[in-house]
Amino acid sequence: MNYFPWLTIIVVLPISAGSLILFLPYKGNKTIRWYTICICILELLITTYAFCYHFQLDDPLIQLEEDYKWVNFFDFHWRLGIDGLSIGPILLTGFITTLATLAARPVTRDSRLLHLLMLAMYSGQIGSFSSRDLLLFFIMWELELIPVYLLLSMWGGGKKRLYSATKFILYTAGGSIFLLMGVLGMDLYGSNEPTLNFETLANQSYPVALEILFYFGFIIAFAVKSPIIPLHTWLPDTHGEAHYSTCMLLAGILLKMGAYGLIRINMELLPHAHSIFSPWLVIVGTMQIIYAASTSPGQRNLKKRIAYSSVSHMGFIIIGIGSITDAGLNGAILQIISHGFIGAALFFLAGTSYDRIRLIYLDEMGGIAIQMPKIFTMFSSFSMASLALPGMSGFVAELIVFFGIITSQKYFLMPKILITFVMAIGMILTPIYSLSMSRQMFYGYKLFNTTNSFFSDSGPRELFVSISIFLPVIGIGIYPDFVLSLSVDKVEAILSNYFYR
């Protein structure tokens, strides 16, 4: 047991400091903005320090554990802890949220509330990744809903922002009902004393029918958030209307919470049901890659096209989770981190382009590479990362998932060949929509009626955010062990404890 409450500080600091924004004397947006950025940087530094000096990489068990009794009636504890599965997403959350706060600089309306909501999201995301109590996980999961709804409805850029915000909250709240039913069902089943402790629940056995019922409840909630087809339709609308700082948080972190939940709860707590349904996950993931890669080129809206590319990339994560192999699951975790960076960067650059040319439809753009060479260079680089160019993080992640499904002992040879073939088609379709997006934006003749003096290329802020994201994308592509070393022992423990015993 760890005696210094590192994780409690990391979870509580953002929302506590965010609440103080309301009491700060108003001296302009600049003060609030710098206060929020300083809180995010402080949080990231504390997290990095705690993980560097108090986390043992070669230990697959839960570390930095904290356990405080909260509600005695149904064994509800403030129970936190991290392992190799959660450390990567937590660091990703800190990194992307800090840059998203910097990206929100152009927003001047209701600046206090905006930054409070971003910090509240920060706490909810870190809390979800570090919870070791099922009900605490649910509460942290729900902490996301209202901030995202308000960020969409108040600072969204399009005419349909209220529609998109309502659609988001209906989908996610609907999924959360199934999540709550699963949480309460697991809490009340079996033992004389109800328990929500992950450790206890991992060793709990259920009748097959009941385990499948719980599995369905959880997978619906996580399928909405991931998203998994056909529960993905909120995502393009949400991304199409949201401010790009919100899009960075959605693409970089929020979608990854669904994938994390699939591994943490469906795989770890319900292994027999997962073993039964993993072939269906692989099939759905394969269909998702093809479906989203085929749908993306038909989108006129730039941000919707990037959103469909996110849906396609999430398909690789689902296949990795369904493969039930060391390589597949490690590849899925690497893809979670990799796409967190790439998705956030693409939305950021799409937003900075919109700030300058005030156009979001691709068929109205064209020929802006000459006026904005820095944005063109960065956008092209991240497009290459998105289509899994060798040397970048996406290539390594997708290659490891490929290897995982090919070497899986669970599937016969012909299904594996078919799945691999369809995945390869999806990877061929990815450059089609990625490169056509760049061509329509940056090449050709100038199609819009604006004077050249209107344009300004990327400033120091945009360059800093873009390069800060690009460096880890290249770093992971060249040396993926930097991320894989965090999760490899935990992945081995999950698979050996639950599938090969």
UniProtKB/Swiss-Prot annotation:
It catalyses: a plastoquinone + NADH + (n+1) H(+)(in) = a plastoquinol + NAD(+) + n H(+)(out); a plastoquinone + NADPH + (n+1) H(+)(in) = a plastoquinol + NADP(+) + n H(+)(out). It is a multi-pass membrane protein. The keyword Translocase applies. GO terms for molecular function: NADH dehydrogenase (ubiquinone) activity; ubiquinone binding. The chain crosses the membrane at residues 4-24, 35-55, 84-104, 111-129, 134-154, 168-188, 209-229, 243-263, 273-293, 306-326, 331-351, 387-407, 417-437, 463-483. GO terms for cellular component: chloroplast thylakoid membrane. One of its GO terms (biological process) is ATP synthesis coupled electron transport. This is NAD(P)H-quinone oxidoreductase chain 4, chloroplastic.
